[in-house]
Regions:
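A short, proline-enriched helix->beta-strand linker immediately N-terminal to the Walker B motif
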Residues: 151-155
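ABC ATPase NBD coupling module
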Residues: 67-82, 106
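Conserved ABC ATPase signature
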Residues: 132-136, 140
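Catalytic Walker B motif of ABC-type/P-loop ATPase nucleotide-binding domains
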Residues: 157-161
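Conserved ABC transporter NBD signature motif
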Residues: 58-69
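Helix-to-loop junction immediately C-terminal to a conserved catalytic motif
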Residues: 50
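Conserved ABC ATPase "signature" region
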Residues: 110-128, 179-180
Length: 192
């Protein structure tokens, strides 16, 4: 099992229990969509899984290792897990291609260039490679962030409302490309 959540409890305050005895298992290469109304805890769950928040009780196990929150682990995240949050955290003075290639090794520059191009194609931004992110729309910045997360080939990709800034036709197109890509690469996807 790639990810296991066992008996998770979490609340923002004593009267606001978001999760009570929550359990989830994610197998390698599987896609799971989290559905629910605004404020129901989808983003909070992704933040708990990534280690950005401490749970009240229970455990989150990724690749056999416990995921600890900030009280016990100063640097959140795991090498084989990436979170694309609703704030995109792009480098504003680096091009789209440089943002996507940020975590790809420079040892083989030709291979890096090919990988960046492949990922830009997945998110439909190949013609924007030399543009600075500050000139992109919110939806385009969102797609750059997804491509950058995919660049490290994580075993688990956490996407927090990844299509929220896209129009309907772009949303469908990106979802199809993204789901096909993660299936081909055997990447597990947890999407809110």
């Amino acid at each position: 099992m790639l990810l296991e959540i066992n008996n998770l409890f979490f609340s923002h305050s004593p009267e606001n229990n978001l999760f009570r005895n929550f359990n989830l298992k994610v197998e390698e290469g599987k896609t799971i969509a989290l559905a629910g109304e605004s404020g129901c805890g989808k983003s909070t769950l992704l933040n708990l899984i990534y280690g950005l928040l401490d749970s009240d009780e229970g455990e989150i196990i990724f690749q056999g290792k416990p995921i600890l929150g900030p009280k016990k682990n100063l640097v959140p995240g795991e090498d084989d897990m990436k979170l694309v949050a609703q704030n995109y955290d792009l480098m504003p003075y680096s091009t789209v291609a440089e943002n996507v290639g940020k975590f790809i090794s420079n040892i083989n520059l030709e291979a890096k260039k090919e990988k960046v191009q492949e990922l830009l194609t997945v998110v439909g931004l190949e013609e924007y490679a030399s543009i600075l992110p500050k000139y992109l729309s919110g939806g385009q910045q969102q797609r750059v962030s997804i491509a950058r997360a995919l660049s490290v080939m994580p075993k688990l990709l956490l996407l927090d409302e990844p299509f929220s800034n896209l129009d309907f036709s772009r949303k469908i197109e990106l979802r199809e490309r993204l789901f096909r890509y993660v299936k081909e690469k055997n990447i597990s996807l947890l999407i809110s």
